[in-house]
């Protein structure tokens, strides 16, 4: 039986978000072995239990109060929310923050040889999908009637198999659609992973742990989005150098031994430093330009 004094977090056991979720928890300093097949893994250094489950079970576990937190794709979360509302329920939860992984889009796709003049082309058609409620909401808003063909996998083969006229499925690169003679015609929902919390009273110790975890997650995401930049720059062109780095904080300026014409500049930039920018910095007289990843960051 689970210990209710420990924070319970549900993550995807395997699939699109699994590896990124494990990496996030690890970078937040949670020491736990998630490479076994166990359903529940206990953290060694914090009162945290990690439940590894199917992704479409995570929203329900949070909404029903079985776990305290869940890392889940917004598409799966929204589908479960709409499903429960359709059954007359009033599901409750909090979205603590959007995460920086798991990006995808839910799109309509039709056979490549069929004309497309907008969603109206689907009126009265049969559409295969694993997301019937998201699809219904979108087409209801457009005033379009359709027949739903619910499939839990291999949705892209439905038109070729004669099961449906079109599909509504997750798309990342579009390669799978192309391989099955389909083309993406309309994006109906964009999704990323998010961290959600159950509704209801939370023990003070648990809430404090959640707040600590949120601070660490923010630091991990900021670190991944930032770079530490060091260079030597001519003193008379410092403002021009800084202007080339719009995402950077004001730099730390250090003197160079025996060189009064140049200084050492250190700064954190929240924007990617492209080769073109580095070439422009060099043209301004900058040298010894280093762009380094940041492991941890806290403001």
Swiss-Prot record:
<dbReference type="GO" id="GO:0003879">
    <property type="term" value="F:ATP phosphoribosyltransferase activity"/>
</dbReference>
<keyword id="KW-0963">Cytoplasm</keyword>
<dbReference type="InterPro" id="IPR011322">
    <property type="entry name" value="N-reg_PII-like_a/b"/>
</dbReference>
<keyword id="KW-0479">Metal-binding</keyword>
<keyword id="KW-0328">Glycosyltransferase</keyword>
<comment type="subunit">
    <text>Equilibrium between an active dimeric form, an inactive hexameric form and higher aggregates. Interconversion between the various forms is largely reversible and is influenced by the natural substrates and inhibitors of the enzyme.</text>
</comment>
<dbReference type="GO" id="GO:0000287">
    <property type="term" value="F:magnesium ion binding"/>
</dbReference>
<dbReference type="InterPro" id="IPR013115">
    <property type="entry name" value="HisG_C"/>
</dbReference>
<dbReference type="Pfam" id="PF08029">
    <property type="entry name" value="HisG_C"/>
</dbReference>
<dbReference type="InterPro" id="IPR001348">
    <property type="entry name" value="ATP_PRibTrfase_HisG"/>
</dbReference>
<keyword id="KW-0067">ATP-binding</keyword>
<keyword id="KW-0547">Nucleotide-binding</keyword>
<dbReference type="GO" id="GO:0005737">
    <property type="term" value="C:cytoplasm"/>
</dbReference>
<keyword id="KW-0808">Transferase</keyword>
<protein>
    <recommendedName>
        <fullName>ATP phosphoribosyltransferase</fullName>
        <ecNumber>2.4.2.17</ecNumber>
    </recommendedName>
</protein>
<dbReference type="InterPro" id="IPR015867">
    <property type="entry name" value="N-reg_PII/ATP_PRibTrfase_C"/>
</dbReference>
<dbReference type="GO" id="GO:0000105">
    <property type="term" value="P:L-histidine biosynthetic process"/>
</dbReference>
<comment type="function">
    <text>Catalyzes the condensation of ATP and 5-phosphoribose 1-diphosphate to form N'-(5'-phosphoribosyl)-ATP (PR-ATP). Has a crucial role in the pathway because the rate of histidine biosynthesis seems to be controlled primarily by regulation of HisG enzymatic activity.</text>
</comment>
<dbReference type="InterPro" id="IPR018198">
    <property type="entry name" value="ATP_PRibTrfase_CS"/>
</dbReference>
<keyword id="KW-0368">Histidine biosynthesis</keyword>
<dbReference type="InterPro" id="IPR013820">
    <property type="entry name" value="ATP_PRibTrfase_cat"/>
</dbReference>
<dbReference type="InterPro" id="IPR020621">
    <property type="entry name" value="ATP-PRT_HisG_long"/>
</dbReference>
<comment type="pathway">
    <text>Amino-acid biosynthesis; L-histidine biosynthesis; L-histidine from 5-phospho-alpha-D-ribose 1-diphosphate: step 1/9.</text>
</comment>
<dbReference type="GO" id="GO:0005524">
    <property type="term" value="F:ATP binding"/>
</dbReference>
<keyword id="KW-0028">Amino-acid biosynthesis</keyword>
<keyword id="KW-0460">Magnesium</keyword>
<dbReference type="Pfam" id="PF01634">
    <property type="entry name" value="HisG"/>
</dbReference>
<comment type="similarity">
    <text>Belongs to the ATP phosphoribosyltransferase family. Long subfamily.</text>
</comment>
């Amino acid at each position: 039986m689970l210990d209710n004094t420990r924070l319970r977090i549900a993550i995807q056991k395997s699939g699109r978000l699994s590896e990124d979720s494990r990496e996030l928890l690890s970078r937040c300093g949670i020491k736990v072995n998630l490479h076994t097949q166990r359903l529940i893994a206990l953290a060694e250094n914090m009162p945290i239990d990690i439940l590894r489950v199917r992704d479409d079970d995570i929203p329900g576990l949070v909404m029903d109060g079985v776990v305290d937190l869940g890392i889940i794709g917004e598409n799966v979360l929204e589908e479960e929310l709409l499903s429960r509302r359709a059954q007359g329920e009033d599901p409750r939860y909090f979205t603590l923050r959007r995460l920086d992984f798991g990006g995808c889009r839910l799109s309509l796709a039709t056979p490549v040889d069929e004309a497309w003049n907008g969603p109206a082309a689907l009126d009265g058609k049969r559409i295969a999908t694993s997301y019937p409620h998201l699809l219904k909401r979108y087409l209801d808003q457009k005033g379009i009637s359709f027949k739903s063909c619910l499939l839990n996998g291999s949705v892209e083969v439905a038109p070729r198999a004669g099961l449906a006229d079109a599909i509504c499925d997750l798309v990342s690169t579009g390669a799978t659609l192309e391989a099955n003679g389909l083309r993406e015609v309309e994006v109906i929902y964009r999704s990323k992973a998010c961290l959600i919390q159950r509704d209801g009273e939370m023990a003070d110790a648990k809430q404090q742990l959640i707040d600590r975890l949120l601070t660490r997650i923010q630091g991990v995401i900021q670190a991944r989005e930032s770079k530490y930049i060091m260079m030597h720059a001519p003193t008379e062109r410092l403002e021009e150098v800084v202007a080339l780095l719009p995402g950077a904080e004001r730099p730390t300026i250090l003197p160079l031994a025996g060189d009064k014409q140049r200084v050492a500049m250190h700064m954190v930039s929240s924007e990617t430093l492209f080769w073109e920018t580095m070439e422009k910095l060099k043209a301004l007289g900058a040298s010894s330009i280093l762009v380094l990843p940041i492991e941890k960051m806290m403001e």
